[in-house]
């Protein structure tokens, strides 16, 4: 009751001893119903899960969807305070154990509701060729990119609404050989294959769902700016561009073909997409 009173007048609230009087007032009843309707509209915009929601791109996605009144769950090694709910993954757990933990937490958070989108932007980078710790780098990249992508796919299979959207994160460089970062290229190529499989008939995803992978060149993140301060930032893709793109496809606007690998290339501060 106090909430409605505060909305009606910034200097007046309804006390509990006046509830009976106001509840029988036609004006109050109309205001009460309108307020409930507004709350329902805001809460029913949609539900999105961001895997990697604490990273730079993930945090940008969480913020963008939250700013547009979406319910957002974040899955990561640490919590994102902007999200509605957080699922913190144990980094020491095995692949199957991580999946089980995430699935149980998602089911509990949703309470029977469905997701409109599952967005996986978890990942990392490690260099190295066949001479330098190849297996170590490949193992790390597999955990960061492939584990998170397959767990996201399983979440989508169980909790995505029909017509929902799944986004994974590949790499434009992994369309070809990556001799100076073999482990990274292997992991991203696996994500590309997963995307094509999820976009095909019989993948196990809900009907009319869309799965794509974004393949950026370089994202404009604080960490990239720290380690490459002299780079041409005009060739880096803004995080807001990706977040807005995800929202558009979540809402069903101008969707690409299912299973598309979407190269994201920025030149002279202009970003263009190409589809494979």
What are these regions (language model features)?
Residues 84-109, 123-139, 180:
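Conserved mid-core segment of classical short-chain dehydrogenase/reductases
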Residues 131-151, 167, 191:
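Catalytic Tyr-X3-Lys loop
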Residues 54, 58-63:
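N-terminal Rossmann NAD(P)H-binding glycine-rich loop of SDR-like oxidoreductase domains
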Residues 63, 149-150, 188-196, 200, ...:
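Conserved active-site helix of classical SDR/Rossmann-fold NAD(P)-dependent CH-OH oxidoreductases
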Residues 131-132, 158, 165-205, 215-218, ...:
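Catalytic loop of short-chain dehydrogenase/reductase
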Residues 119, 148-156, 160, 194-195:
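Hydrophobic positions on the long internal alpha-helix
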Residues 209, 213-214, 221, 230-276:
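C-terminal helical subdomain
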Residues 51, 115-123, 145, 168, ...:
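Rossmann-fold scaffold of SDR-type NAD(P)-dependent oxidoreductases
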């Amino acid at each position: 009751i106090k909430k409605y009173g505060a909305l009606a007048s910034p200097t007046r609230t309804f006390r509990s001893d006046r509830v009976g009087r106001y509840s029988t007032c036609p004006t109050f009843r109309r205001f009460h119903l309108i307020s409930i309707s507004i709350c329902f509209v805001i809460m029913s915009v949609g539900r999105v899960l961001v895997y990697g929601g604490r990273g730079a791109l993930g945090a940008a996605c969480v913020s963008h969807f939250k700013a547009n009144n979406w319910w957002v769950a974040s899955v990561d090694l640490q919590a994102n305070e902007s999200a509605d709910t957080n699922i913190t993954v144990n980094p020491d757990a095995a692949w199957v154990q991580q999946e089980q933990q995430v699935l149980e937490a998602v089911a509990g958070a949703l309470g029977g509701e469905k997701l409109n989108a599952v967005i996986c932007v978890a990942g990392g980078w490690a260099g190295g060729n066949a001479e330098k710790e190849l297996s170590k780098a490949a193992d790390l990249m597999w955990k960061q990119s492939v584990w998170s992508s397959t767990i996201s796919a399983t979440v989508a299979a169980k909790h995505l609404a029909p017509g929902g959207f799944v986004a994974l994160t590949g790499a434009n460089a992994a369309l070809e050989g990556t001799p100076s970062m073999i482990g990274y290229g292997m992991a991203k190529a696996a994500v590309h294959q997963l995307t094509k499989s999820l976009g095909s008939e019989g993948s196990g995803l809900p009907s009319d769902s869309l799965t794509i992978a974004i393949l950026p060149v370089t994202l404009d993140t604080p960490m990239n700016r720290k380690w490459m301060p002299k780079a041409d930032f005009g060739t880096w893709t803004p995080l807001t561009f990706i977040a807005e793109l995800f929202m558009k496809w979540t809402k069903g606007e101008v969707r690409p073909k299912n299973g598309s690998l979407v190269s994201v290339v920025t030149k002279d501060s202009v970003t263009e997409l190409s589809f494979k």
